[in-house]
UniProtKB/Swiss-Prot annotation:
InterPro entries the UniProt entry points to: Aminoacid_DH-like_N_sf, Malic_enzyme_CS, Malic_N_dom, Malic_N_dom_sf, Malic_NAD-bd, Malic_OxRdtase, NAD(P)-bd_dom_sf, NAD_malic_enz_proteobac
Residues that hold NAD(+) according to the record: R157, D270, N418
Cofactor note: Divalent metal cations. Prefers magnesium or manganese.
Active-site residues per Swiss-Prot or TrEMBL entry: Y104 (proton donor), K175 (proton acceptor)
Family of this protein: Belongs to the malic enzymes family.
Protein's gene: maeA
Record-listed E.C. numbers: 1.1.1.38
Annotated protein name in UniProt: NAD-dependent malic enzyme
Amino acid sequence: MELEYESKRPLYIPYAGPILLEFPLLNKGSAFTNDERNHFNLHGLLPEAVETIEEQAERAYRQYQDFKNDDDKHIYLRNIQDTNETLFYRLLEAHLSEMMPIIYTPTVGEACEHFSDIYRRARGLFISYPNREHIDDMLQNATKQNVKVIVVTDGERILGLGDQGIGGMGIPIGKLSLYTACGGISPAYTLPVVLDVGTNNPQRLNDPLYMGWRHPRISGDEYYAFVDEFIQAVKRRWPNVLLQFEDFAQKNATPLLNRYRDELCCFNDDIQGTAAVTLGSLIAASHAAGSQLRDQTVTFLGAGSAGCGIAEQIIAQMMSEGLSEIQARARIFMVDRFGLLTDKLPNLLDFQSKLVQKSDDLHHWNLHNDAISLLDVVRNAKPTVLIGVSGQPGLFTEELIREMHSHCARPIVMPLSNPTSRVEARPEDIINWTDGAALVATGSPFPPVSYKEKLYPIAQCNNSYIFPGIGLGVLASGASRVTDGMLMAASRALAESSPLARHGEGALLPNIDDIQAVSKAIAMRVGQAAQLQGVAIVTSEEALSKAIEHNYWQPQYRSYKRTSF
């Protein structure tokens, strides 16, 4: 039976007694009214007092504060989510900036590493390779019937932690929590999925409590055939769903995106979401400095799918500001573990080969080795923007940052690797090394830096600024695809919300507590772009705005009426 969750009208429920209390989407706990307790056989199953959701949230927050470490806080919040989802999101709404780092990065990394140890209750779908002949049946088994947003991972590249097997399920769960908390997408319409294709992590394979398929990862044609079976089954079950690929390994992420982006409504957050939020931040930073992105020279540490995805978005924006493609690409320098990507490097991936520098253009550089290091690039290319997506901590050294500052009065430094333990440099060090001149944005949350009696806000360049608004915009507009134009629109909407760009002071990105308003603004731009590009029905701006508000779920209890099957 399908329940209609969006309306403000009473909800007709076929469940009663203990079964109703076990249904997280419907459970109100002590907030069931006396009338509801009569009709749903709940008397005796709950304490006498009838509470409001505000009273429940106050108790939950007090309990939350009793936990002293972040891992325990994460487990506690997940337990509330698996007991009473409306209360969970009401609690998040009241304490979003405090709790977002607990339910997602950086704490979710630990939760993924210890997924099998802290496992308490099933959430989402575990699609395992040994059961590949039953994928359609598994999708039918989902407790949610009208799924509109899926986040799927195969657990191979979880944050900067590598292969976590089914432990990677923590990421789709956390990501979808933010779709709801930040983008207002009803939890009744979200589904986390992990594709269990084995693991090459010996710690997981040798862990007696590991709950996944104990087998080396499948790969090649076998792997792609399995993913395709899943995608085709999703299309049969929920043909209009928005599917987000999450934390797939570099070797698979881009091929999967390229294969399916024109087949169903999908995107890859690591490639496209990261690019969109980074681009939005850079546009805002450029405007705050009185310039355009076309004026910047950008160096990347990390030339994987995420780094190259960001670079391509930057190039597209530079071209929209008047540069030719050749001119724009000449301003991008990609560095990986083998050094600067040039046309002489062998074995480059397809998406890397478009971002190489021509060796003939570097003959005037002062070099001492064949491999061109990050420091060589900073000394010779003199970048104004430095972006880290390497997953390797500490590589933005004092020497490197001081060298950058020697030729750039206001350097933009963005160590984006997650979790915090993998960050390329700590904001406090960057501020100190540049005498307070650097504009810093990070992937994980950091507190403001105090330097010479001045407080420097550190922007968290987190995808959560982008993907909830994209999801809301897709659902509100009915978009059938996620296009590059929709992603560009999201970046520009984010840039326009920057306090620094708008007022010349303050943080580069809005406060997390304002993210719901930001998501609605992004949703409007995304929906308009979808209409312009022909992947959504054209409506008036007023109609789209009403659709966004209609689709925006609020964590409030609805009244229930009893019905029968």
